[in-house]
Amino acid sequence: MAKKIRIIDSTLRDGMHAVSHQFTPEEMAEIAAGLDAAGIDTIEVSHGDGLGGSSYNYGFAAAKDEDYLKAVSQVLKNSKLGVLLLPGIGTAHDLEMAAKFGAKVVRVATHCTEADIGEQHIKIAKELGMEAIGFLMMSHMVPPEKLVEQAKLFESYGADAVYITDSAGAMTPYDVKVRIEAVKAAVSVPVGFHAHNNLGLAIGNTLAAIEAGATYVDGTARGLGAGAGNSQTEILVAVLAKLGYETGVDLYKIMDVAEEVVAPKMRRPQIVDKAALSLGYAGVYGSFLLHAMRAAEKFKVDVRDILIELGRLKTVGGQEDMIVDVAYELSKANKQ
């Protein structure tokens, strides 16, 4: 019997980074209807930085969270509606609102050393009848044993699964393998993996995760996402089918959604350009890229220098304000 792999598609959440959070509710509904018809298990919807993310710091979205969720929930027939929540950005009220509009799955995302700040949100989600998944961001920054400790915390709070998340697209297949194997051996809940393609390794890393025991993996149509994007859902489905895995996704239909519905809405090609490659090389949070590109233009400095310095400083999600500081200091140094 073929091994079942659950695909969570994040085109309508991670993909929001690549369009500056400007998908309209109508565009989201159109994409979601296609993903649903293709057989995607779970469709994640929200601002790129999760529920409540629309703000000056993270970028204002084209519409409110509830407008997106309402629009998507009305077109789903089989897929589960999911959301992302970062404690400190999203609130318990946001969770309650999401549940009201039909969200069945929430991924509670914390920095890879801070699972404890997600305890309240995991427990509230469970009380609301939602599937709650712990999402350990920037997992390349700590060794496997630290991720084990944090994954066990999420499990103790009641999480239904735990994700190892390569937010910077900085991992190699070996990095993924040792982390997934360690966490898989330590928890009794399913383990998942979320990839970014900044080193061109998103699909390879996702396969390494599956071989190491992950049964939940992420993708986005056309790879739409922060930095160089994510694992392309349509490629992931094709490769997993060749390897004998069962995803429940219709390959032709997911190809059609990617090419005919998502591609025309893309602002720029989702490629590993020099800026995205610098993200992965430096190990910098993927959503920093567009902010860094704007700062580079404003201060007339090389975006790569900004990203490398942010990596040296070991910045994490939530420290977007440092991008301008770094760009300013580089500009000042260049004039001396």
UniProtKB/Swiss-Prot annotation:
Pfam families: DmpG_comm, HMGL-like
Location of the active site: H17 (proton acceptor)
EC number: 4.1.3.39
Keywords carried by this UniProt record: Aromatic hydrocarbons catabolism, Lyase, Manganese, Metal-binding
Catalyzed reactions per annotation: (S)-4-hydroxy-2-oxopentanoate = acetaldehyde + pyruvate
SUPFAM superfamilies, per database record: Aldolase (SSF51569), post-HMGL domain-like (SSF89000)
InterPro entries for the chain: 2-IPM_HCS-like, 4OH_2_O-val_aldolase, Aldolase_TIM, DmpG_comm, DRE_TIM_HOA, PYR_CT
Domain called Pyruvate carboxyltransferase: residue spans: 5-255
Domain of life where this protein originates: Bacteria
Entry-linked PROSITE patterns: PYR_CT
Residues that coordinate or bind Mn(2+): D14, H194, H196
Top EC category: lyase
Residues under site feature: Transition state stabilizer: R13
Annotated residues for binding of substrate: R13, D14, S167, H194, Y285
One GO molecular-function entry: 4-hydroxy-2-oxovalerate aldolase activity
Gene Ontology BP annotations: catabolic process; L-leucine biosynthetic process
Membership in a protein family: Belongs to the 4-hydroxy-2-oxovalerate aldolase family.
Record-given protein name: 4-hydroxy-2-oxovalerate aldolase
Species in which this protein is naturally found: Carboxydothermus hydrogenoformans (strain ATCC BAA-161 / DSM 6008 / Z-2901)
